[in-house]
Amino acid sequence: MTKSFALALGGGGARGLAHIAVLEALDEMGKRPAAIAGTSIGALIGAAYAAGLSGKAIRRFVLRLAHDRAEVFRRLIATRAGTFANLFNLGFGSATLVDAEKFCQQFLPDQVPEDFGELEIPLTIIATDLYRRQQAVLSSGALKPALAASIALPTVMRPVVLADRVLIDGGATNPLPFEELRGRADVVVAVDISGAPTEERRDIPNPWECLLATVLVMGNAITAEKIKHGAPDLVVRPRVGAFRALDFLQASAILRAAEPVKAELKEKLAALLEG
């Protein structure tokens, strides 16, 4: 009898577009996860897949946007939490550019529903409770506010208030939430897109790039410690470390770089499910 599996999709900004290659590989295998857990970009892509979109449909949606910069800019304008001039204010409190909930409305496929209960695959979303200093696990109720909370990167996106909790990006506490899937399937698969270390780059990043890179470094450290204390059954790592967190307009290049992960996933997952 074939075993069931659950899928954890990690955070990492634009690198998370590599998750699409993983979903395409599952479609090619004819396999669907029993449950999905996601953080940040992993939550967004996981929601689209859980809503019934195929990996290829998600790819088409992303590439259509990435190849139309005017449309991307138009949608970004609609997500503003304030004026773009606020970016240059000294107080970070007024420097937030994007309303995370508006972002989800603008940049998610129309097929993504309003409520967790309408999804075809159970989905768990990770955000961070800013004042309780712990992760927030969201799996029922309104879907898009939960997604917004999971991607609400401080200084870039406004925090989201849910049930009297102030929530920010889930990557601050749990960038790869595989442990949330234990006991929900026979096999747990985690997709880590934090990127391998590199000694090749020597360029000095600008302040925003440095901030975002720091978040990724911290997330990588959190994930490494979690794996030490109890690894999932399978971890796959698309080779997308050369891309920066905001390289969304390089979607085609990210997807090309992620393509080799398909063969690895198919071979290793098939062995686990049939073993």
For the regions a language model picked out, list residue spans one by one.
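Patatin-like phospholipase
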Residues: 1-39, 47-275
